[in-house]
């Protein structure tokens, strides 16, 4: 289980990313066109509003590593839930 403060920090970052995504994309488009003022405006936005600062975390325990995008959970929880038959369409393979 990850620390609650780390999970809360990541939730806050996710909200900031969603809030500023459109404005950030528009500013980046203007910067690519050569507008220097847009670069200054982009620098004024919060650092945590950048998408690269958000970390994928397991929805169940907040684990930041071993994240499986398809299911939104960590490999540890995936193995537990798949073994218990809770995840639909997933079964243990044998050949």
UniProtKB/Swiss-Prot annotation:
GO CC aspect terms: cytoplasm; small ribosomal subunit
Pfam families given in the database record: Ribosomal_S14
GO molecular function, one term: structural constituent of ribosome
SUPFAM superfamilies per record: Glucocorticoid receptor-like (DNA-binding domain)
Keyword vocabulary terms for this entry: Ribonucleoprotein, Ribosomal protein, RNA-binding, rRNA-binding
Family, as annotated: Belongs to the universal ribosomal protein uS14 family.
Its biological purpose: Binds 16S rRNA, required for the assembly of 30S particles and may also be responsible for determining the conformation of the 16S rRNA at the A site.
Subunit structure: Part of the 30S ribosomal subunit. Contacts proteins S3 and S10.
Protein name as it appears in the record: Small ribosomal subunit protein uS14
Organism of provenance: Fusobacterium nucleatum subsp. nucleatum (strain ATCC 25586 / DSM 15643 / BCRC 10681 / CIP 101130 / JCM 8532 / KCTC 2640 / LMG 13131 / VPI 4355)
């Amino acid at each position: 289980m990850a620390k609650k403060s780390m999970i809360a920090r990541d939730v806050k970052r996710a909200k900031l990313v969603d809030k500023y995504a459109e404005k950030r994309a528009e500013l980046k488009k203007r910067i690519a066109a050569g507008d220097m003022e847009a670069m200054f405006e982009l620098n004024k936005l919060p650092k945590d509003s950048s998408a690269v600062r958000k970390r994928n975390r397991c929805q169940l325990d907040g684990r930041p590593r071993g994240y499986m995008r398809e299911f939104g959970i960590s490999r540890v929880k995936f193995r537990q839930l798949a073994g218990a038959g809770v995840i639909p369409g997933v079964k243990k393979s044998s050949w």
